[in-house]
Amino acid sequence: MFMGEYQHNLDAKGRLIIPAKLREQIGPAMVLTRGMEGCIFGYPLTEWAKIEAKLAKLPLTKKNARSFTRMFYSGAMEGEFDKQGRINLSPTLKKHAGLVKECVIVGVSNRIEIWAKERWEEYSDEANESYDEIAEDLDDIEL
C-alpha cells in the first residue's frame, strides 16, 4: 500500500526521483498515465493489469467510455527506473500535470500520484477545508 507525501524536483532531462520506499513496492517498472485533478497516476504493473481488465469491460457504445479510455491510454507510458531511482516522464504527462520543476509524489493506496508542487498545495488546502464533510458523505465505509 502506498502512502505519504514526498517532494522532489525534475532534473534538466525531465526525470523524477521516486523515493526508495515507494520503488520497493512498485518493482522495476510502472505505468504512468493522466490522472484526475491535473496529476499523474502511477501504477505497479500488477495494479495496471487489474485496471486494464476493468476498462476492457466498458461499453464501446457509450461516448464517455470511449472518451475516457482514449485519454487514459493515449497518455499512458511504461517507465523503468534508472540506477538512481529516476523515471523519465513523457512531455504529454508533464504538460498534463503542469510539471516544471518542483513536484510532490503522493502515495494513495494502490497508486502513486505526481503533482506540480503548486497545484498540490492548492488542491490539498481546498480538500483540507472540506475533509470532515467528505468523511461524513462516505460514512457508509465505516472508518
Curated annotation (Swiss-Prot):
Give UniProt keywords alphabetically. Cytoplasm, DNA-binding, Repeat, Transcription, Transcription regulation
A Gene Ontology cellular-component term: nucleoid
Q: What is its main location?
A: cytoplasm
GO terms, molecular function? DNA-binding transcription factor activity; transcription cis-regulatory region binding
- Determine if NADP is one of this entry's keywords: no
Top-level taxon in the UniProt lineage: Bacteria
Name the InterPro entries on file: MraZ (IPR003444), MraZ_C (IPR035644), MraZ_dom (IPR020603), MraZ_N (IPR035642), MraZ_sf (IPR038619), SpoVT-AbrB_dom (IPR007159), SpoVT-AbrB_sf (IPR037914)
Annotated Pfam families: MraZ (PF02381)
* SUPFAM superfamilies from the UniProt entry: AbrB/MazE/MraZ-like
Under the subunit heading, UniProt states: Forms oligomers.
Protein name, UniProt field: Transcriptional regulator MraZ
